[in-house]
Amino acid sequence: MGSCSCTRRHFLLSICFLQVITIIERQVFDFLGYMWAPILVNFFHILFIIFGFYGAYHFRVKYIITYLIWNFLWIGWNTFLICFYLNVGQLNRDSDLLNLGTGSVSWFEANGYGCKPTYNMAADDTFRPQRPERVEGCLLDYPLVEITHSGVQCALALLGILGAILISCIFLDEDDRFDFMNGDAKSPQHTVVHPMYVSYTSIPTTSASATMQSNKHLQLQHQQPQQNSLKLYHHQQQQQPKLHHFNKNYQLSGSNNNTLNNNLHQRAPALLPPNTTNNRSASFQTQSHPSNNHVTQRTGGEGSNCSSLRRHRQHHSKALVSPSPMSPQTTPSLSYASLQNSSPYLAGNSLSNSNYSIFQSPDSLQGSSHFARIHHKPKPPKSDYPVSGEFNPGGNISSPVRPLDRLSRSLEDDEDNFSLQKFAPGEHGVTYVPFQSPTPNSLFLGENNNSQPHLVFHTNSRSSPNNNAYPYDQSGLPSSLRMGSNSNARRPTHIPLPTVPMHNCQEVENDEDADGESEQDHDQMLTPPPPPLVRPHIHQRLGQAPYLDLSPEVAERYAIPSKLGPSLPIQVPLPVPHGSPMVRRSNRRPRPSNPVNFCDQIRATPPGYVVRAQSDDRLMEQVEADAAPHVNRRSGRGGSGQKTRPRSFCNSIVGVQG
């Protein structure tokens, strides 16, 4: 049916095209014969043909129906013309009915093919067009030509009516298939303007990175229950044959990010050491046998991507490690780590500084433990401090870092809002530091936590390839945390601020084989920085000045006498002194106190200089203009015959009135 509709549409478009061609041809000959009534009707016919063409092309039924109705009227008009030229009834083709009283007739009457008209020169009415008395030798008489034109128009109108009816039937009889607003779906030429509804929403305030981070955080929260169930089943299968050995040596394995697994704590709370608190905010290790140095390897379940290898060393296992107890009166600290640990939802965001970015694991959201994952960005070492620590066989451990400069060294090494002790980065540059919520009370001293044990860090004297100069295990984990036995000692609360080294202007030789004494001598010799080099002015370097020379010798050449005083004779210009303009400016004498009119000068640009606005050429033109006849009617002359200078603010300065 779609192909049929396209065929009907093409048929109607073809009929409209033929009608336009024939009516234009008829309109031209009607203009030549001054037939005004057919001319007006032909204009209307051309207009309705355009309506029909547009309706058939765009499937507009209203335009097609309008074209259909006009075709009936057009057939009636052409029928009248046929009857008029055939003299049917009382109609007479020699009357003035079609020419509207102008007396004109069809152009084909005297200009037909082979026609030879004969005119009567003795015409009575000179205002009417002259008609021939008789015409001989015409191939076709003009009435026959006009009847042929009208018959062709009637035939085309009938075909147009047929095509319009066929297309209108598609619109009127098949409304269930054809959508009036959308038109025929199978016609690619159909173009309809449809209303468009636009909904305005506010601009999102969150960035793309924050949105991606929040989506990842929610996804990890949804996956956490399933991972916990898998890890619980896996640990139950592995810990069943090793339950009798659990009191001697155990180590808790984490998930994919090597964090603390809380499921094993919930299954065996009685097996934990008595000095372990309930918050479980650190990875801990019991005192094992000195000869027990086996390797424990576990996986965190099916979701684990790699195995975590942990090797226990003898010097690490000779002392108990326990996290600092959590006090409800812990002094809050305005540090970056406490801000991250106090708000679990804030820790998931992309808050970071230049060297570290802290991320809290989703595993810590369900329990009370908090872990900060520090993404370390390695940078060149700034300073190394000689740290020495000794182990007592009795279990007492001396702090490897002096209490006064424990935090000051971290402030000196890391110029950030958040800085901790030097930890070794683990795998993929990630270091895990155990924290307590809301703040790690072992790192911040106050009045209410002086009597509590504090965390100290173990070090080694051997060199390390990392920036922190601390050893780390093969698995990438930092050294275990130690607590000294003398935990009741009061720690100082006044920590000195870091000092900034002075600027050393002495050139240091980059000799790698130089001894230590020479390096210390170079470091102790501190001198102030050298003064900046004196650079000549830009005009002195270029050898020229951007402003004109206004030395007294040159200024006298441009001095214009006041109009109130007598006119001075023109002086011979003095020779220009030799040298650059800068040399002449530096050697000039003080200006004489002669009253000079500064109306021709600009005193404001730039400060300290006076720039002349008129040159020698303009002064010569002014002299010639004064000598020439007065032709400028806008500027008058004074009574003395001199040209009056226009008033300006310069007149009030020098005391001259215009």
Curated annotation (Swiss-Prot):
Biased composition (Low complexity): 322-335
Sites bearing Phosphoserine, chain numbering: 291, 308, 398-399
Subcellular location: Cell membrane
Keyword Cell membrane: yes
GO cellular component: plasma membrane
Region (Disordered): 222-241, 248-337, 571-601, 621-658
Top-rank taxon, per record: Eukaryota
Feature: compositional bias, Basic residues: 309-318
Membership in a protein family: Belongs to the NKAIN family.
Name assigned to this protein: Sodium/potassium-transporting ATPase subunit beta-1-interacting protein
